[in-house]
UniProtKB/Swiss-Prot annotation:
Residues 1-28 form the signal peptide. PROSITE patterns: TYR_PHOSPHATASE_1, TYR_PHOSPHATASE_2. InterPro entries: Prot-tyrosine_phosphatase-like (IPR029021), Siw14-like (IPR004861), Tyr_Pase_AS (IPR016130), Tyr_Pase_dom (IPR000387). The gene is tpbA. PANTHER family: DUAL SPECIFICITY PROTEIN PHOSPHATASE TPBA, TYROSINE-PROTEIN PHOSPHATASE. Belongs to the protein-tyrosine phosphatase family. Disruption phenotype: Inactivation of the gene alters expression of diverse loci. Inactivation of the gene increases cellular c-di-GMP concentrations, increases biofilm formation, EPS production, attachment and pellicle formation, and causes cell aggregation. It also abolishes swarming, decreases swimming motility by 40%, and affects colony morphology, converting white smooth wild-type colonies to red, wrinkly colonies. Mutation reduces extracellular DNA (eDNA) and decreases cell lysis. The tpbA-tpbB double mutation restores eDNA to that of the wild-type level. Mutant forms flat and thick biofilms. Monomer in solution. This is Dual specificity protein phosphatase TpbA. Induction: Expression is regulated by the Las-QS system. Probably negatively regulates indirectly its own expression. Keywords: Hydrolase, Periplasm, Protein phosphatase, Signal. It catalyses: O-phospho-L-tyrosyl-[protein] + H2O = L-tyrosyl-[protein] + phosphate; O-phospho-L-threonyl-[protein] + H2O = L-threonyl-[protein] + phosphate; O-phospho-L-seryl-[protein] + H2O = L-seryl-[protein] + phosphate. Residues 44-188 form the Tyrosine-protein phosphatase domain. Pfam families: Y_phosphatase2.
Amino acid sequence: MHRSPLAWLRLLLAAVLGAFLLGGPLHAAETAAPRSPAWAQAVDPSINLYRMSPTLYRSALPNAQSVALLQRLQVKTVVSFIKDDDRAWLGQAPVRVVSLPTHADRVDDAEVLSVLRQLQAAEREGPVLMHCKHGNNRTGLFAAMYRIVVQGWDKQAALEEMQRGGFGDEDDMRDASAYVRGADVDGLRLAMANGECSPSRFALCHVREWMAQALDRP
């Protein structure tokens, strides 16, 4: 049967389109990486609330409507990395508030160790929520360093959770990612274990300690 060039062109286009429609979803399914069960699990996407462990949650800035949920989760302490007063949304809820305003683009090792220690201390009293404004950059940084220093994850595993865990766009976590990539993991773990303020002997916190000791000498 004779077909015109236009008919052959239509058949070719139909074949290409069919292959695309059949192969596209299959290819996407093959290339989409499954979400690790070890990553923080979603609790309330409206405030980017995730459960990292039975005693540690992370989120964006909550609101007054979040209080009932946090009470059901038995959160005892809220740790904030922004300047806003958490009492504005917590009201009179029986939750301890810890304010630790930070900047992900200029955080240092001493600040990270201080936050990790305060998180651990608060966890001993019950579940803790840490948050910043959007729940990805500052919160992502401290969540990743908690995974690495406290829980023993390696950098790559913590970075994968940070960037692919559903907390926000990867571009919004550039500062956090940069700190994690450059972190002296062994030094931070050793300083954490030894109760030191920083892995660097020349850190400002150590200089302050030396000055205080010098002033205390008779």
